[in-house]
Structures are given as structure tokens and as C-alpha cells.
């Protein structure tokens, strides 16, 4: 290296150290990209820039990666550890790959001919200054003078990202394609294409001029026809109907501002640091990969809190991906939040489109336009925030519009990315509990925002886990090949409804497959399983350890996030959380861990986040506990009868065969932990571990009681209507919750009973005429009687006096 260049770099390092704060993507490239530090690495940058090279060096040293300014010594040769792809006088407007770059690639390839153990890793790296894609009417980026570079350093110094890409194995390249000069040229060309794709995935398409977009949409034949129909139906002039359509567009459409996104990034960085001890992000590489491959990405998260809108966009921005346009409820379009959300990417949607064809047409075409222009989109498939902590039944309208846009000729593959979002504390959880007890939902407004801000404090950990993507084109090709048939105008395809329902359910399953187990929801689950919401410290720790071993040894799914802390560390963490409701008390016998009564209701919310993970082990434990001695055949038969209802209610992913395999693994683990004994084909209770078995079994207790209530009503009155069945089931459940101290508000939630009756219908418990199939109902009711305490059965039977009133209503 020349002394002049060395001097220049030393001078340049000073302003960089003051002005630039960069973020590496991914944050741990060695593990996330699978880099082998025992083998040489060569960094490839897209264009010549000493500034970018020095920023890369700083990040490499911080990440324990080889210094790019130190040469690789291979077979007695010293070769540069970095290379610039082209001159870079214009951003992504190349004069061609530098000849010395191709020459260096060839020299590295040639070294592999004589050393089979050598595997040089070629790592593409981009240094991004700012993330604004610009407007559609803006000119292409021009030559940057030194003065302009200084301005960029000042303006974007805190908005700088170093993006490491998947390494290319030169050993593999040589084995597959040889080590000729043509291969070196091909490597350089492929690298150029990769950098162009990477820039697009980080910045996205140009932002539209809002009015120009409106002018285009308002002239679409479908909207023109809807305007004419509106004018005819309401007997108003067409110009007035057109004004209404324009007003709807203005109400709906986002108005993205990169300046707002940058400001939001600063504010949210402060907010997360104030609120949470950490935000745990998993599987973001899935999203980066889809973005690089040019997919239209649709993010579909579960909806726990209004914080979800902000958190997901923030995480995506810091993962080097364009934040999406977000479908937000019209209730959030209030000052000052509405304008801020709109400029941050929110587009607003009314609660219902029913009876408003003009609105539904305009909204559908706006959504399709976002897809066609290449903007990623986010919508909440549950339709609203879950008040119980469970996933709600999916609302399929947005999925339907997505498939319709695809069928109309979207030229890129669509991938739906389910996202699990979880918190150790949800700001609105107190409000949810009140609403479940019958309080009216409070309308969002500025005063409500201020009240929430006052609650800002240590809220523990947050979790964002990107689930397995659903590649819609491939899914439809496999399950609904007729989707490729040309659509008939004004005729809804027969396959569409079934496909929409199937994809919506799969999204929910994949969200649950990506759940995060944390200290609060696990310890809360254990305490809620105890009769008095209290356990000795020793028993609590033993139960938590039992669950951790179960989750590790009998995996629910490969996407689940499990704690890395010990049971003791998890307990200390929860005890330190404000308003957790978990308290430590000491007496002459030792330390007790207790959950106070008021907090018990709130804790059910967090338990419900992960209830689907332990419901199957709980069912197995309950079968052994209540039978005292149970054969594997009995266990399998019982699970086979009850599992379909659990699968529908909790969006479980096992099919009929897989669930029996999972049961076998659970039994093996219970035997290994000595919770049960195994003799021949019979499993019996290990009295020494009886408390542990009881706590495992309690996880499904309330669910089985709900099922038994509805089935008992069906047996008493087979002609009962579905509506009345759900109503009377809820009444009995409310009575049961009072008499037996059940603190879970969802125990008598209308939606859960509705899901159960729908499952009964789907599983053939009603015939084609809607009559109850008594034999099937009696069979499952008989199974449930063996799994429910006599006291609870008597309470339910006592409440069955209401059946006489039902009969009178039916007559």
C-alpha cells in the first residue's frame, strides 16, 4: 500500500469516527452466514470507495472478522483481502468490471487447483448510506463530488448499514465449473447483479407521486364502472360519485416519507431501549432471502398490541429490508397519530366493506396497485388485537384480495411471511381484561395515547420471529392447480374460497409454529396450573425445568424460540419485572412463589401465547393421571378423539399420523423424566413425581371442561340450535368459573365456543340435516367424563336444569 493512500485513510478515519455510526446486517455474520474463519475470506465491495472500505474495516474488527486491509497469505502468495467491483463513479451505473478485479478473482480460483483443502470464501458487502429510494419523478443519482460525499456523511452518518451477504465458496466453483478466466468474469458479473438486487431489497421501488397514483387508479375500468353504479344507485351526478371515489382514495392511501421513517427510527430506538430489556429477532434471514429473490412479500403478524405496527417496521428497517405498507384500522386515523402513521407507510381500512361496492372496489384496486409496484405489504389477519392472548379466527378478506391480484397477472411470486410477535408485558392488557368482563371498547384518541405513554417502564423482553413463508404460487400450484385458468369476468372462481380459507389457516399454524417461550409466560403457566396459584420455590423450579426439557427433547417445531436461561434465572427475572404479579414470600417452611388474584386474570393472557405448545403433553398427562393406569392403546384412542378439536381451536400443525408419533415422543420423555412408569404396555403414575404430573395435566383442564359442557347440552337436548348451544354453553361456563375459581376470561368467550361448534360440524357430529349424531357425541362425552373431576361434573349437571328452559323455547 502506498504511503499516500495510507495517509489519506488515516485522515479519513477521523471524520468517520465522529460522524458515522453503522449497523452490521446480520449482527452476527460468522454464525448466521456460516463463515469459516479457518479459511481465507475476500470481501467484495460494489464500487471503489475508501470511505466504505474503512467502515467495513471498523465493522469487521468489531465482529471478529478478518481485517480487510490485511492481506491473505496463501501458498506463499500475499493477495488483497478486499476488491472493488468497478470504479463507482456513478452509483450502480458502471463503466464495466475493473480488469484487476477479474484478474484477482482468477488468481484466487487458480490457487484451488493445487490445494484441495483450500476454500476461499468470497463475501459480498454493501455499505448503504441512507435508505431512501427517491420519488418516481426524481432523476437518477449523479456523480458524487467530494463535497457531496461529505454532505452524505453528515446527513446519513447515523443511517449507515453494512450488509454482509452469503459467502460464495471458490472451492465449490472450481469443482463445478473449473478455474478458467471465463469463470472469473462470470463471478464478477454475478456479483454486479447481486449488488443491484441487494440495493433494491434494502431501498425498494421508487415512491409514487400520490396524486399521479390517484389519477391512474380513478381511470381503471373497474373503478369507472363502480363510480357509474354508485351514481345510478344513489341518483347523483357522475362527477359527484367520482369525487366520492377520490375522497375514499385519500382516506385510504399511504403517503410514505423517508424523512418520517428516519425520524421514527430515532424515536423508536429510544422507545425500545426505555421499554424493553431487549428485542429478540429470529429467522430474519428468510425475509432477506425472499427480498433478494424479488418476491412480493406480505407480512402477516399476530396482533397483540398497537406496538406491533411500530415494532415490525423498526425490526425490518434494521434487518436491511424495506419497511412495508401497513393496513391499519381506520380507528387509528386520529390526530396526531394518523398523519404520522400514514407517512410511515400506513394505509387505512374500514372495519367493514359490506354494502359499499365503491369503497370495496377502490380499496381492492389500491391494494393491487401496491403489489404491482413492488411494495411489501403488512396486514393483520386476525382483524384486531387479541384480547385473550390466543390467535383469533382469521379474517380472510385481505387474503382473498391478495389471491385475486395474483390471478389477474402479478408478474412476481408472492410470499406470505407469518410473524410471531410476543411481549413479556403488553401495555393494553389491563384494558383487554376489562373488555372481556363486558366493558365497552375505548375509542383510540390522543388522550388515550398520553395515558399509555405514562405507563412506559421496564417491560421485559420483546420477541419477533419470522415463521416459515408460504410461497403462494407454489402452494396454489400444488393444492389448487385450476387457479391458472383464465378468470371469467364478474364470476368468482370456485376454487377461490377454499384456497383463501386454506392459506389463512396455514398462516395461523405457521405463526404458532414460531412462538416464543419466555420467563413470564412459562412461569405464569406453571403458577396458573396450581390450585391456589402458589407453589414452593423448589416445586416451581422443578416444573419449569420439566417443561424446558420437554420442549427441547420433544420439539413442537423447529421455529420455536426457547429460553437460554436456567429456571432459577428465569424466576429471578420475573420477580424483578414491574407489575408481573409474581411474588416471593417466606415462612417457616421455606420460600413460596405466589401469583396474586388480580394478576392471575392478566397472566392468562401470557399463558395463552404458548398454550398450544403444551396442550398435547397436558392431554397425555391428564389421561394417565385420571386413569392411574393407561395402556398406550387407550392413550392413542383418547388423543385421536379429542385432538381434532384442539387442532382447530389452537391452530396445531400435526396431522392424524404425526400427532400419534408426537404422543409417543411425549410418553418417552415423561418416562425419561420419571414422571410416569412404564411396564409392558401400561403407563402408571410415579407417586414420587405426582405433583409434576398434576401440573402438566392442568394445562388442558379448562379446555376439556368447556368441551364437556357443550357435549352434555347436546346429549340433553339433541335438537338444540347451534346459536342456542353456544349461548347456553357460555352461561354454564360462567357459572362454573365462579364456583370453581377459574380466572381465565376466555373460558366463556363466545368466539371459542363458536369454533368448537364449527369443529363439531366439520368432524361429522351433525348429519346433513343438522341433527345431532348421538352416538358420536356420547362416545366423546364418555371419554371426557374420565378426564374431568367429579366436582366439576356435578356443577355442570346442576346447571343442566337450564335445559328445560331450552326445550320450552324450542317448542
UniProtKB/Swiss-Prot annotation:
Its membrane topology: Peripheral membrane protein
Localization of this protein: Cell inner membrane
Swiss-Prot/TrEMBL keywords: Acyltransferase, Cell inner membrane, Cell membrane, Lipid biosynthesis, Lipid metabolism, Membrane, Phospholipid biosynthesis, Phospholipid metabolism, Transferase
Pfam families according to UniProt: Acyltransferase, GPAT_C
Key word Membrane present: yes
Pathway(s) where this gene product acts: Phospholipid metabolism; CDP-diacylglycerol biosynthesis; CDP-diacylglycerol from sn-glycerol 3-phosphate: step 1/3
Keyword Phosphoprotein: no
Catalytic activity: sn-glycerol 3-phosphate + an acyl-CoA = a 1-acyl-sn-glycero-3-phosphate + CoA
GO MF annotations, alphabetized: glycerol-3-phosphate O-acyltransferase activity
One GO biological process term: fatty acid metabolic process
UniProt note: domains: The HXXXXD motif is essential for acyltransferase activity and may constitute the binding site for the phosphate moiety of the glycerol-3-phosphate.
NCBIfam families: plsB, PRK04974.1
Protein name in UniProt: Glycerol-3-phosphate acyltransferase
Amino acid at each position: 500500500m502506498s504511503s499516500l493512500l495510507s495517509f489519506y485513510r488515516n485522515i479519513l478515519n477521523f471524520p468517520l469516527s465522529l460522524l458515522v455510526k453503522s449497523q452490521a446486517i446480520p449482527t452476527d455474520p460468522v454464525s448466521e452466514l456460516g463463515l469459516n474463519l479457518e479459511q481465507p475470506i475476500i470481501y467484495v465491495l460494489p464500487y471503489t470507495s475508501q470511505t466504505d472500505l474503512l467502515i467495513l474495516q471498523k465493522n469487521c474488527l468489531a465482529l471478529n472478522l478478518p481485517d480487510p486491509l490485511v492481506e491473505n497469505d496463501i501458498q506463499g502468495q500475499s493477495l488483497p483481502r478486499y476488491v472493488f467491483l468497478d470504479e463507482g463513479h456513478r452509483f450502480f451505473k458502471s463503466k464495466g468490471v475493473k480488469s484487476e478485479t477479474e484478474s484477482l478473482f482468477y488468481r484466487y480460483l487458480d490457487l484451488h487447483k493445487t490445494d484441495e483443502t483450500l476454500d476461499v470464501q468470497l463475501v459480498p458487502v454493501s455499505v448503504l448510506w441512507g435508505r431512501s429510494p427517491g420519488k418516481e419523478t426524481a432523476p437518477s443519482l449523479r456523480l458524487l463530488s467530494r463535497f457531496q460525499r461529505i454532505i452524505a456523511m453528515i446527513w446519513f452518518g447515523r443511517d449507515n448499514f453494512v450488509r454482509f451477504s452469503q459467502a460464495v465458496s471458490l472451492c465449490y466453483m472450481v469443482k463445478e465449473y473449473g478455474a478458467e478466466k471465463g469463470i472469473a468474469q462470470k463471478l464478477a458479473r454475478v456479483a454486479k447483479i447481486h449488488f443491484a438486487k441487494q440495493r433494491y431489497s434494502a431501498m425498494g421501488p421508487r415512491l409514487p407521486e400520490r396524486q399521479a397514483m390517484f389519477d391512474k387508479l380513478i381511470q381503471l375500468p373497474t373503478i369507472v364502472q363502480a363510480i357509474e353504479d354508485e351514481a345510478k344507485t344513489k341518483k347523483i351526478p357522475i362527477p359527484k360519485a367520482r369525487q366520492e371515489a377520490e375522497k375514499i382514495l385519500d382516506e385510504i392511501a399511504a403517503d410514505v416519507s423517508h424523512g418520517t421513517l428516519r425520524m421514527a427510527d430515532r424515536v423508536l430506538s429510544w422507545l425500545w431501549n426505555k421499554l424493553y430489556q431487549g428485542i429478540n429477532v429470529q429467522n430474519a434471514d428468510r425475509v432477506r432471502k425472499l427480498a433478494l429473490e424479488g418476491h412480493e412479500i406480505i407480512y402477516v403478524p399476530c396482533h397483540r398490541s398497537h406496538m406491533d405496527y411500530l415494532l415490525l417496521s423498526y425490526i425490518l428497517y434494521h434487518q436491511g429490508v424495506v419497511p412495508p405498507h401497513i393496513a391499519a384500522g381506520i380507528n387509528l386515523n386520529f390526530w396526531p397519530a394518523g398523519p404520522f402513521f400514514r407517512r410511515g407507510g400506513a394505509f387505512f381500512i374500514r372495519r367493514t366493506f359490506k354494502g359499499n361496492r365503491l369503497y370495496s372496489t377502490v380499496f381492492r384496486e389500491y391494494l393491487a396497485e401496491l403489489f404491482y409496484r413492488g411494495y411489501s405489504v403488512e396486514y393483520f389477519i386476525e382483524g384486531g388485537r387479541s384480547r385473550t392472548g390466543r390467535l383469533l379466527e382469521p379474517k380472510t378478506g385481505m387474503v382473498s384480495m391478495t389471491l385475486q391480484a395474483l390471478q389477474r397477472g402479478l408478474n412476481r411470486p408472492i410470499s406470505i411471511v407469518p410473524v410471531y410477535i410476543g411481549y413479556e408485558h403488553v401495555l393494553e392488557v389491563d384494558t383487554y381484561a376489562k373488555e372481556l368482563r363486558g366493558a365497552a371498547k375505548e375509542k383510540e384518541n390522543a388522550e388515550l395515547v398520553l395515558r399509555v405513554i405514562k405507563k412506559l417502564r421496564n417491560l421485559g423482553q420483546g420477541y419477533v420471529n419470522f415463521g416459515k413463508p408460504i410461497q403462494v404460487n407454489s402452494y396454489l400450484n400444488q393444492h389448487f392447480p385450476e387457479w391458472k385458468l383464465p378468470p371469467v369476468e364478474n364470476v368468482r372462481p370456485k376454487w377461490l374460497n377454499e384456497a383463501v380459507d386454506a392459506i389463512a389457516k396455514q398462516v395461523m399454524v405457521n405463526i404458532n409454529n414460531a412462538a416464543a417461550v419466555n420467563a413470564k409466560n412459562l412461569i405464569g403457566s406453571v403458577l396458573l396450573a396450581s390450585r391456589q396459584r402458589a407453589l414452593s420455590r423448589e416445586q416451581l423450579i422443578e416444573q419449569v425445568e420439566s417443561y424446558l426439557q420437554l420442549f427441547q427433547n420433544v420439539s413442537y417445531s423447529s421455529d420455536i424460540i426457547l429460553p437460554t436461561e436456567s429456571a432459577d434465572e428465569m424466576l429471578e427475572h420475573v420477580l424483578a419485572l414491574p407489575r408481573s404479579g409474581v411474588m416471593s414470600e417466606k415462612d417457616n417452611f421455606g420460600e413460596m412463589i405466589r401469583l396474586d388474584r388480580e394478576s392471575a386474570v392478566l397472566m392468562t393472557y401470557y399463558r395463552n401465547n404458548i398454550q398450544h405448545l403444551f396442550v398435547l403433553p397436558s392431554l397425555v398427562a391428564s389421561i394417565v393421571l385420571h386413569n392411574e393406569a393407561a395402556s398406550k392403546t387407550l392413550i392413542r384412542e383418547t388423543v385421536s378423539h379429542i385432538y381434532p378439536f384442539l387442532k382447530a381451536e389452537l391452530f396445531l400443525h400435526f396431522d392424524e399420523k404425526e400427532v400419534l408419533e408426537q404422543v409417543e415422543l411425549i410418553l418417552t420423555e415423561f418416562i425419561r423424566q420419571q414422571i410416569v412408569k412404564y411396564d409392558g404396555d401400561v403407563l402408571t403414575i410415579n407417586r414420587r413425581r405426582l405433583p409434576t404430573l398434576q401440573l402438566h395435566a392442568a394445562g388442558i383442564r379448562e379446555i376439556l371442561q368447556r368441551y364437556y359442557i357443550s357435549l352434555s347440552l347436546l346429549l340433553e337436548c339433541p335438537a338444540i340450535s347451534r346459536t342456542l348451544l353456544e349461548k347456553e354453553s357460555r352461561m354454564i361456563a360462567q357459572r362454573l368459573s365462579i364456583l370453581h375459581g377459574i380466572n381465565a376470561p376466555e373460558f366463556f368467550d363466545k368466539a371459542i365456543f363458536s369454533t368448537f361448534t364449527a369443529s363439531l360440524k366439520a368432524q361429522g357430529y351433525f348429519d346433513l340435516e343438522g341433527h345431532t349424531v348421538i352416538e358420536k357425541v356420547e362416545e366423546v362425552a364418555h371419554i371426557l367424563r374420565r378426564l374431568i373431576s367429579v366436582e366439576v361434573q356435578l356443577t355442570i349437571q346442576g346447571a343442566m336444569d337450564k335445559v328445560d328452559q331450552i326445550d320450552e323455547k324450542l317448542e
